Amino acid sequence: MSTPDPSAPDPTTPNPGTPDLIASGPSPVSRTQLLRWQFDLTWSLFEYHLERLEPSDFLWEPVPHCWTLHRSADGTWEPDWAETEPDSVPVPTIAWISWHIGWWWSVTLDHTHGRQPRKRTDIIWPGGGAPTVRWLRGLRTEWQTVLDGLTDTDLDATASFPWPDDPAYTVAHTVAWVNTELLKNATEIGQLRMLRAAS
């Protein structure tokens, strides 16, 4: 029977020359970093479509049963609206979805900054094409500033929107909700843009 070589590595112990894959992986990210990364990813997907939108895309109606925006007597745009969601739900145009983004995001920012939240009727859609794209990009810049100022401790505070003062929901939930709502609306706009381009 052969005698084991004392200089040979013990097969029952980890090889000291092999890196520990877990220990040598990426450094852990904080909750604020992860939420910011998710927001930036969502925005990059949205930007793909914003860069390709034509002014005529905004009011295009893919089906007769649509929600869109209409010129009022004073020249501003007014969205279709119902206090109780209709059954069946109308298909929104790109104009309506972009106004909707501006509405919920502006109100979210009002709450974040401690301002008096604007009413739905206070949110004025700038019009199709570049004005609305600039508006949405401006909201993104303002939201980035909010995210940059948040700490993980801030995320644990009770949310004031969209769940008014419910201790079950925190600022972290609000930030995650913005990411999700923006992704949903960006997907809707992207799908409408591609349908019109293909029609």
Show which residues each predicted segment covers.
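Short, contiguous alpha-helical
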Residues: 2-123, 161-199
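Acidic/histidine-rich alpha-helical segments that form the ligand environment
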Residues: 124-156, 173-183
